[in-house]
Amino acid sequence: MATNSTDLPPQPVVAPELAPSLRNRADQSNSPYIQGQINSPVAWQLLDDEAVERAKRENKLIFLNIGFKACHYCRLTAIDSFSHPECASLLNEAFVPVIVDREERPDLDTIYMNYVQAVNGAGGWPLNLFLTPELEPVFGGTYWPGPGAHTKTGPEEEEGVDFLAILKNLRKVWQEQEPRCRQEAKEVLSKLREFAAEGTLGTRSTVQMSKIGLTSSSTAPVASAVSTENPGAGKTAADVSSELDLDQLEEAYSHIAGTFDPVYGGGLRDHVGGCGFARYSITPDWSIPHFEKLTSDNALLLGLYLDAWLISNGDKDGELYDVVVELADYFSSPPMRLPGGGFASSEAADSYYRRGDTDVREGAFHLWTRKEFDAVIGDEHEATIAATYWNILEHGNVEPDQDPNDEFMNQNIPRVLKEQSEIGKQFGISGEEVARVIASAKAKLKAHRGRERVRPELDDKIISGWNGLVISALARTGAALAVKDAAKSAQYLGAAIQSAEFVRAQLWDEKEKTLYKVFRGTRGSTKAFAEDYAYLIEGLIDLYEATGEENCIAFADELQQTQIKLFYDASAPTTSASPNPLPAHSSCGAFFATTEDAKHTILRLKDGMDTAFPSNNAVSVSNLFRLGVALATETYTALARETLNAFEAEILQYPWLFPGLLSGVVSSRLGGRTYIVVRDPSGADDETVRKVFIKLYGEARGGLRNLIIVKGPDDLVVRRNPALAELVATGKPGAYVVEEGKFRPCAKEDVEY
């Protein structure tokens, strides 16, 4: 019998499914920065599908915090804001709070930093943003003081709105003006996409900008930007840049040579312990740093100071040599060199002043009162000389107007203002005696610091690309010292080799042919970005040239093939349905920073400009040219030229912003001299071979020469290069030069140093 639906028994009313309450997921990350928030009252989420889907389902703004463990203001934000009960409660109730380690996701850091810099005129860390559930930026900034906190980020900063007020305002705006927020966020994203057109405006024509005059025109803005009062600094706080024009022209050296003394003599350098350079100075005279030390910065500085030393004289004396050895020792020793061979990421800005202290302070490990300084040195006369040398003053050497938060009252940051010869005249003693006193004082201060103080906390993440930077710097340094200091050379080359072996074993998936980004006890899930491939390939090529180890260039070749496959812009333009839509004219060569299927990434960028890091495209161009020569692979050379073409429009308009790519322009236009060293199987290399090594390792890297080392007929370089195979089969051990595709024995003028 048919039954009317109204006759059915009443159905139970099912309540809409409630989303589970937020819980802090920081313990699911292996990042030291994120793990630092495990006990935070904020219910931190990781940037994954779960967090993004929750934001969409609950229609909430995402609060995105991007930072890193060594960062001073990241720690203050965690204390002043994230630990504040009302701030934490509001974050959990009205937003989906997401935390990201910038060193694990540099792609996100770059995208959202571009936004904050465009809107606010400046950036920094922590990077704090409010995003739509589609990850489009609505509002952002850097450090915001917590409720009741009065911390300033600089002497001229005025007290502004605190973090709690910002949270309340953003909650209200989203509740009352969501359509407007979404529309403005889409407009902002459109503008960011236009900005991201870098590297998509070039043509596939012959490289028109390969006129060498471009390199000289690029030095004029560099020269005008260098302050004569504070060399190396511009109009604002000083930032260490390693991509100045050392690789381009000797002329540029005159513009930047004045930078070296104030940087290595300033407050950024650890004068007592030789433990690297702090990341940047908050004053234009390089006197007051933020004390975090990043592996990437110090690796790049090692390469820069190595070039400066080689250009100046290459002798085993002088401050430049001391800086080179200090930095190389810093990397090839604990704690930066970790068990197993990888290099740690950073040392924190904040530390305990003495063992047993309960609160950390910025720079505490590196600061000295005059009273403690004198007591440690002991001898009054020697203490006076050392204090004069390092500018250690009775009431501290940080001016009150440069210390808005009173962190450095009566404290001294060692820095050198006078030459030792000048101090010798002041005290009526010889320069040699001054040097002896300084060395003695340094040893006493270092020993005291090691006993009484706690070294800043280490971020022991091993980053594949940053390890590539260190491998490159140590390989070049070890090679340069091969004749001058064999023991140091072996130490540095050994550390570089061990790191390369570690990265291959732990971060390279041989089956997938994929490089991963981070190792910390175990391999992380994040795959490497284009910059990681570029930096690691460069390090391996440098290590091959320094050691002749075939597995280095073989691994570099594997990585290069994968980088091209994953990141090179060789496909047709993607459609608007793609997760990462691109401008219609985007398919014109060069490397994207991310893969096409990168998740939770609103833009796919190509970087050509050098920043605090060398651009991945500039390094990749150099790698392609070098591998193209060593492995006789024309495809690599063609892709290098095509990558240069992709940035043609920008380079022609602003050449001084692209020093790394300009080096590629020079290589493309002039080529380079290639040296072939065929080793004697008996190990009895002749004098010419020795002179080739001395010449090439004793020169600053200029991108205009290549070195191929042959140990036997089965070498990869021989198998890939028929002409080289013929030379090995018919020639004798020794040194050769390639000219117009032909080999000839090195003449005297080829190896003159």
What are these regions (language model features)?
Residues 2-469, 473, 479, 574-582, ...:
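Replace the tail clause
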Residues 318-325, 387, 490-493, 497, ...:
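Conserved positions within tetratricopeptide repeat
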Residues 297-301, 466-467, 532-535, 616-619:
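Catalytic-loop motifs flanking and including active-site residues across diverse enzymes
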Residues 333-339, 505-534, 541-722:
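Long, polar/charge-rich, low-hydrophobicity segments
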Residues 243, 247, 436, 482-486, ...:
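Hydrophobic, structured segments
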Residues 308-319, 477-489, 543-550, 627-637:
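Inter-helical turn/loop segments and adjacent helix faces that build the functional surface
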Residues 85-89, 97, 270-299, 472-547:
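Extended hydrophobic/aromatic segments used for targeting, binding, or gating
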